[in-house]
């Protein structure tokens, strides 16, 4: 009876751990050493503060086999239910300012902006694309599955592949690397637990051609 009771207790523990890991989106719970906790959850909108300002260097393919380079400045101002957000998008020839409201729950734009749609598309398909992957809070735990990409042939998982101390323009950052591989090259997004947006990304298409890459250049935080 003692042996049977001990086996049941062990089985119960294993089942509970598996349930927790499953809720965190783990492909292989048995290989996950760290049990996910609430403080491991991250979302792209939860750590923004009034007055936070970020500057990025963005390189993006324009679809014509050419590469465009931009400086992207993002300033957040607090408002009820939304962040009043100012984007300044600059390249060698011009600078464009866009003022909009982003939802505090998922960074979606409150209203569509027809006038500056070209630049909105640039933002949505690069730095702000994380909102389409992390539609709800996700675990910053190695092995956690965040989403998947359907190529028509394969269903490619997007998951946390590693933890990395990243040297950046704003200092050394502890980051988690969100990765997926459509062909041969791995697409990676570096996320710091205490920042509301990724600090670096390098993304490739199904032909291993660069879609976009960006790095954070500076940040000015207003944590009270």
Question: What are these model-derived regions, one by one?
Answer:
Residues 1-5:
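Short, low-complexity patches enriched in S/T/P/G
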Residues 10-106, 140-224:
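Acidic, serine/threonine-rich low-complexity disordered tracts
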Residues 113-142:
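Acidic/charged, solvent-exposed loop-and-adjacent secondary-structure segments enriched in E/D, K/R, S/T
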